[in-house]
Amino acid sequence: MRLRNGTFLTLLLFCLCAFLSLSWYAALSGQKGDVVDVYQREFLALRDRLHAAEQESLKRSKELNLVLDEIKRAVSERQALRDGDGNRTWGRLTEDPRLKPWNGSHRHVLHLPTVFHHLPHLLAKESSLQPAVRVGQGRTGVSVVMGIPSVRREVHSYLTDTLHSLISELSPQEKEDSVIVVLIAETDSQYTSAVTENIKALFPTEIHSGLLEVISPSPHFYPDFSRLRESFGDPKERVRWRTKQNLDYCFLMMYAQSKGIYYVQLEDDIVAKPNYLSTMKNFALQQPSEDWMILEFSQLGFIGKMFKSLDLSLIVEFILMFYRDKPIDWLLDHILWVKVCNPEKDAKHCDRQKANLRIRFKPSLFQHVGTHSSLAGKIQKLKDKDFGKQALRKEHVNPPAEVSTSLKTYQHFTLEKAYLREDFFWAFTPAAGDFIRFRFFQPLRLERFFFRSGNIEHPEDKLFNTSVEVLPFDNPQSDKEALQEGRTATLRYPRSPDGYLQIGSFYKGVAEGEVDPAFGPLEALRLSIQTDSPVWVILSEIFLKKAD
């Protein structure tokens, strides 16, 4: 009985231990299961984060590839321009779909600076960088491109006189190796159309050949000038004028940069010296180093400044960064300062360094002749002292004659000197009935005549409503048949009371034509003024060609 009870107790104790062991194991197994679940969840979360990081990395890699492609494109275009491929212009910038990513707001994209960052209003219109007017043949591949900005002036425009001077001093070879680009920097379509048509009428050959081009900016190119702040003591109107002027220069440079090797900045109120183009080109080619940035052919303002076309992008970008802040001549000097001046050195050292980039040619090749500035109400009589004396008329040999006039001569500018090609004739305001007469010492036959009034420095001093008249030599001993032929011919021409026959008249300050051989020998030629003139008069060129 006692043994049976002990066996029972032993069995009971064993079962209890087994139960406790199973319970402990079960509890321990349940705890381990919870830990495994935790680790599994963490591994899954880590895997998701790694996947997201991989996707973000791929996204950024694509965006960086876009940036790299844009940089490669810019480098290739610059190299293409260097190699002579000048077909791409800044005017096509808005047409490039690859530019669109830089115009939007992307969170993780590197934003490259473009013209739109400095002129964000251009994004409002796709045509903002396209010329509103473009006349010409689009010539490229030349040595020299000349840019002339022109704006409306209240008193007098010098543009056509400037073009006459520039074109007349070019040789046939130079006309084939250059382009003159006129920027009519106005948004009034009627005004730009009128100026364009006038240029086309006066220079049809140059337009057709590709020598001369006329452009004007889009009305959407300019920003709102009413928000400009005054600076350096300049009133708002002057700040607006100089700000717009900076943008005009940029537009011209952007248009011209792909057309040639060199770009020369000019103004619309200048006169040029003979052989100016070859002189500039040779001076550039003779530079011992390519480090130069500006070659100056005039000491005044922004006249006669030559740049390498490859440098125009840098210059335009710099001007656009500060176009609202300072005038163009200051900005040009700042570009040189940034490139070569050491802030730890003195001003003299800086000037020496800048002199290596900005090289002056003497004597000056261009003279400023305008007196009425493009800034309303401003009179400026700037003259380049290094220009020297310029022969403003072509050389001719006139037949011997006695010259006389009823006009009152101004100072030493006599009619005799003009006839002998020593100077021009300048007189006070003509009145109706005044005359200029050339009486030949011996009667002679004339083949043709040419008179030009006004000159590049005083283009408004012209002859208006003035006729050209000749007096035939009536010799009773002459051949009767020839005499009869001459009398018959004279019936076709208006005759004055004193026997002079009208054979021509002045148009836009010029009178030219051929002399009818039937007149025979002539005693005299006369310029007769028919009406009162509002201005003084200059006779800058006199050419009387004898018949062979």
Swiss-Prot record:
<dbReference type="GO" id="GO:0000139">
    <property type="term" value="C:Golgi membrane"/>
</dbReference>
<keyword id="KW-0325">Glycoprotein</keyword>
<feature type="topological domain" description="Lumenal">
    <location>
        <begin position="29"/>
        <end position="548"/>
    </location>
</feature>
<keyword id="KW-0735">Signal-anchor</keyword>
<comment type="pathway">
    <text>Protein modification; protein glycosylation.</text>
</comment>
<protein>
    <recommendedName>
        <fullName>Alpha-1,3-mannosyl-glycoprotein 4-beta-N-acetylglucosaminyltransferase B</fullName>
        <ecNumber>2.4.1.145</ecNumber>
    </recommendedName>
</protein>
<dbReference type="InterPro" id="IPR056576">
    <property type="entry name" value="MGAT4_A/B/C_C"/>
</dbReference>
<feature type="glycosylation site" description="N-linked (GlcNAc...) asparagine">
    <location>
        <position position="87"/>
    </location>
</feature>
<dbReference type="GO" id="GO:0005795">
    <property type="term" value="C:Golgi stack"/>
</dbReference>
<dbReference type="GO" id="GO:0006486">
    <property type="term" value="P:protein glycosylation"/>
</dbReference>
<feature type="transmembrane region" description="Helical; Signal-anchor for type II membrane protein">
    <location>
        <begin position="8"/>
        <end position="28"/>
    </location>
</feature>
<keyword id="KW-0175">Coiled coil</keyword>
<dbReference type="GO" id="GO:0008454">
    <property type="term" value="F:alpha-1,3-mannosylglycoprotein 4-beta-N-acetylglucosaminyltransferase activity"/>
</dbReference>
<keyword id="KW-0472">Membrane</keyword>
<keyword id="KW-1133">Transmembrane helix</keyword>
<dbReference type="Pfam" id="PF04666">
    <property type="entry name" value="MGAT4_cons"/>
</dbReference>
<keyword id="KW-0333">Golgi apparatus</keyword>
<dbReference type="GO" id="GO:0005793">
    <property type="term" value="C:endoplasmic reticulum-Golgi intermediate compartment"/>
</dbReference>
<keyword id="KW-0328">Glycosyltransferase</keyword>
<dbReference type="GO" id="GO:0019082">
    <property type="term" value="P:viral protein processing"/>
</dbReference>
<dbReference type="GO" id="GO:0006491">
    <property type="term" value="P:N-glycan processing"/>
</dbReference>
<feature type="topological domain" description="Cytoplasmic">
    <location>
        <begin position="1"/>
        <end position="7"/>
    </location>
</feature>
<dbReference type="Pfam" id="PF23524">
    <property type="entry name" value="MGAT4A_C"/>
</dbReference>
<comment type="similarity">
    <text>Belongs to the glycosyltransferase 54 family.</text>
</comment>
<comment type="function">
    <text>Glycosyltransferase that catalyzes the transfer of GlcNAc from UDP-GlcNAc to the GlcNAcbeta1-2Manalpha1-3 arm of the core structure of N-linked glycans through a beta1-4 linkage and participates in the production of tri- and tetra-antennary N-linked sugar chains. Prefers complex-type N-glycans over hybrid-types. Has lower affinities for donors or acceptors than MGAT4A, suggesting that, under physiological conditions, it is not the main contributor in N-glycan biosynthesis.</text>
</comment>
<feature type="glycosylation site" description="N-linked (GlcNAc...) asparagine">
    <location>
        <position position="103"/>
    </location>
</feature>
<dbReference type="InterPro" id="IPR006759">
    <property type="entry name" value="Glyco_transf_54"/>
</dbReference>
<dbReference type="GO" id="GO:0046872">
    <property type="term" value="F:metal ion binding"/>
</dbReference>
<keyword id="KW-0479">Metal-binding</keyword>
<feature type="coiled-coil region">
    <location>
        <begin position="36"/>
        <end position="83"/>
    </location>
</feature>
<keyword id="KW-0808">Transferase</keyword>
<dbReference type="GO" id="GO:0005783">
    <property type="term" value="C:endoplasmic reticulum"/>
</dbReference>
<dbReference type="GO" id="GO:0008375">
    <property type="term" value="F:acetylglucosaminyltransferase activity"/>
</dbReference>
<keyword id="KW-0812">Transmembrane</keyword>
<comment type="subunit">
    <text>Interacts with SLC35A3.</text>
</comment>
<dbReference type="GO" id="GO:0006487">
    <property type="term" value="P:protein N-linked glycosylation"/>
</dbReference>
